[in-house]
């Protein structure tokens, strides 16, 4: 297991349920549905999905759910507020190490295109990995939902799509708007009422509670809405996504338990 800054233990992973075949995701909605599904698991689980394309190439989707524990003192479960604080401060964190180890254990190849998808805290982890894994893996795209990632960089060669709800204040916790860059698109949806607005426009707040506004399943529904959105910026993300998902692919999914293990002195 990997520790902060190297070997030691924090962020270790273990197989949870082995591998299973399932239908391959076909778009943004399917990807976020998987993230929401993993968030309902009984433990701190991340998913690594292998997509075997008809031409013999392979793509990978890495799914990272959100925070499970409000604990500020680091415990065994790394999906906690201690990880949030580390991510916000730019410090090493157990989740980033754990997801990287899950990718290594799953067999992700250095040249295989990878999509990193995450909800809330998981989106911060995915965005950090887009930078930290440069030179180790080929990160093609990042998909976040309800995540405060405005102050986090995304490398020029990575295409990112950020989903937010107008009534959800969690994406604003870092105090920084998402950059308006050629490789980064933000879609903000106002709940309820459907429809989506591109690049940070907010269509007026409606009285939805934070529970709904910050729900992983609500974001999965928003992702499905965005799938139907006609916009050049979203089309750019779809092109990157297609390079990972392929067409007519065969999917094999693995799930990994992630734990914060005390480093050995």
Q: Model-flagged regions — what are they?
A:
Residues 117-127:
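Gly/Ala-rich beta-loop-alpha elbow adjacent to hydrolase catalytic centers
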Residues 1-6, 14-112, 134-265:
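Alpha/beta hydrolase fold serine-hydrolase catalytic domain that processes acyl esters and thioesters
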């Amino acid at each position: 297991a990997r520790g902060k800054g190297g070997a030691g233990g924090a962020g270790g992973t273990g197989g949870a349920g082995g591998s299973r075949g399932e239908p391959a995701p076909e778009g943004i909605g399917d990807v976020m549905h998987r993230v929401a599904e993993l968030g309902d698991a009984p433990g701190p689980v991340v998913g690594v999905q292998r997509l075997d394309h008809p031409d013999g190439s392979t793509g990978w989707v890495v799914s990272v759910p959100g925070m499970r524990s409000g604990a500020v003192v680091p415990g065994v479960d790394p999906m906690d507020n201690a990880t949030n604080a580390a991510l916000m401060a730019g410090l090493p964190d157990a989740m980033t190490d754990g997801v990287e180890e899950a990718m290594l254990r799953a067999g992700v190849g250095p040249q295989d295109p990878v999509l990193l998808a995450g909800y809330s805290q998981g989106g911060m982890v995915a965005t950090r990995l887009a930078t930290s894994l440069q030179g180790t893996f080929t990160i093609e795209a990042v998909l976040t939902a309800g995540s405060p990632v405005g102050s986090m960089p995304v490398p020029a060669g990575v295409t990112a799509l950020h989903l937010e709800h107008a009534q959800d204040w969690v994406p604003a916790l870092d105090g920084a708007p998402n950059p308006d860059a050629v490789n980064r698109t933000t879609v903000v949806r106002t709940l309820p009422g459907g429809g989506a607005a591109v690049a940070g426009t907010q269509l007026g707040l409606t009285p939805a509670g934070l529970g709904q506004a910050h729900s992983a399943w609500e974001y999965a529904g928003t992702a499905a809405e965005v799938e139907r959105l006609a916009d050049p910026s979203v089309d750019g993300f779809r092109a990157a996504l297609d390079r990972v998902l392929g067409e007519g692919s065969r999917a094999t999914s693995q799930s990994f338990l992630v734990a914060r293990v005390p480093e050995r002195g």
